[in-house]
Amino acid sequence: MKSIFLVFFAVCLVKAEAGKGRKREPNIINPPCRECYVQDSSGNCVYDKWGCGGARKREPNIINPPCRECYVQDSSGNCVYDKWGCGGARKREPNIINPPCRECYVQDSSGNCVYDKWGCGGARKREPNIINPPCRECYVQDSSGNCVYHKWGCGGARK
């Protein structure tokens, strides 16, 4: 029994030593598609009903984009790795909020934030004091009245 254990232990040590010299590759998921999706020949994520239970289950709502965490869908529909969304060294600017108006405001056709009384209770409530500028947190109103992202007001590194 001891000899079997010693042989097993020796084999494990040899395998461990052999694996030490290998170069570690980053954790790139290939394909980068979510569960129930596979990557086709052109790199797009397509739904794989057989990988998700086939005819026994209904096809779930299609996830758009169907990319896994840490991936974003580019303009051609491919899932590409987004290192900043996955703990990259620099902090990314947040996704731009569109429209960037505060609660009770909507963006008109020219991009200005205007008060929407119906979105805030309509005739039942008084119109609150107008917030000037009516932009959300991290946004400021420029000279033409549009809300633009202000990275310094959102924790950006100061000079």
UniProtKB/Swiss-Prot annotation:
GO cellular component labels: extracellular region; nematocyst
Propeptide: 19-26, 59-60, 93-94, 127-128
Keyword annotations from UniProtKB, A to Z: Cleavage on pair of basic residues, Disulfide bond, Nematocyst, Secreted, Signal
Localization (cell): Secreted; Nematocyst
Keyword Cell cycle in annotation: no
Signal peptide region: 1-18
Protein name in UniProt: U-actitoxin-Avd13a/b
Keyword Signal: yes
Function: Inhibits ion channels.
Cystine pairings recorded for this chain: C33-C45, C36-C52, C67-C79, C70-C86, C101-C113, C104-C120, C135-C147, C138-C154
Family statement: Belongs to the sea anemone BBH family.
